[in-house]
A protein has these predicted regions:
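Short, structured beta-strand/loop micro-motifs enriched in basic residues and often containing a Trp
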Residues: 93-103
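Short glycine/serine/proline-enriched coil/turn segments at secondary-structure junctions
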Residues: 124-126
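N-terminal capping segments
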Residues: 21-89
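Bacterial N-terminal signal peptides that target proteins for export
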Residues: 1-7
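Aromatic- and glycine-rich peptidoglycan recognition patches
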Residues: 28-31, 105-107, 128-185
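Structural motif
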Residues: 115-117
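C-terminal motif of bacterial Sec signal peptides marking the signal peptidase cleavage site
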Residues: 15-17
Length: 185
């Protein structure tokens, strides 16, 4: 009998202290990241580049001497850019494809601004598998910062390994889409 009273008391306290579902704790406003946030994110990407950050699939290490992948770079740069603001990322860990499908507003090439998202993939596929931060479009070339690991010479040695500043022709088939990061507050 004492055990039954104890169980009922504990359950009652638990139920009273829990949210009964009438309050919506997921309510927030979602917007495109303001231009100044995107520019700050790009500035943090430059710092990663200057720090000789290495590439590592699945990497999202916030400490120096780090390894980071393409989506981790974007996430960390935006997280740093959002410090001391009222904004947050929609989700704290995302793949490039998830950002493309769920955490960005798609824009045209002519709408790109520094710090916007470049969604990329293999030349022979329409799938988004990769992401970079836009810097500028100049003389028919798109300049960006990304994190990658590539053997561009075909010799089995990765001559690109880490956060890089690169550019491709604006018509390169690896470009799949462009976007603005979505944030919430």
């Amino acid at each position: 009998m004492k055990f039954r009273v104890l169980v009922i008391t504990v359950l009652s306290i638990f139920l009273i202290s829990c949210n009964n579902g009438s309050e919506d704790n997921t309510s927030f406003t979602e917007i495109d990241a303001p231009a100044e946030i995107s520019e700050r994110a790009y500035s943090f990407a430059q710092l990663y580049k200057q720090s000789d950050t290495e590439y590592h699939l699945g990497g999202q290490d916030p400490v120096r001497a780090i390894q980071i992948d393409c989506s981790g770079l974007i996430i960390m740069c935006y997280k740093y850019a959002l410090v001391d603001t009222k904004y947050q990322l929609l989700v704290s860990d995302m793949t490039a494809n998830y950002m493309y499908r769920n955490a960005s507003t798609h824009i045209t090439k002519s709408e790109l601004k520094k710090g916007n998202l470049i969604f990329m993939g293999e030349s022979d596929s329409s799938e988004v598998t990769y992401i970079a931060l836009f810097e500028k479009l100049e003389n028919g070339r798109i300049y960006f910062i990304d994190s990658t690991q590539k053997d561009t010479n075909g010799d089995g040695i990765n001559d690109i390994d880490g956060v890089t500043y690169r550019n491709y022709s604006e018509d390169d088939s690896r470009f799949k889409a462009f976007g603005r990061m979505r944030v919430k507050y």
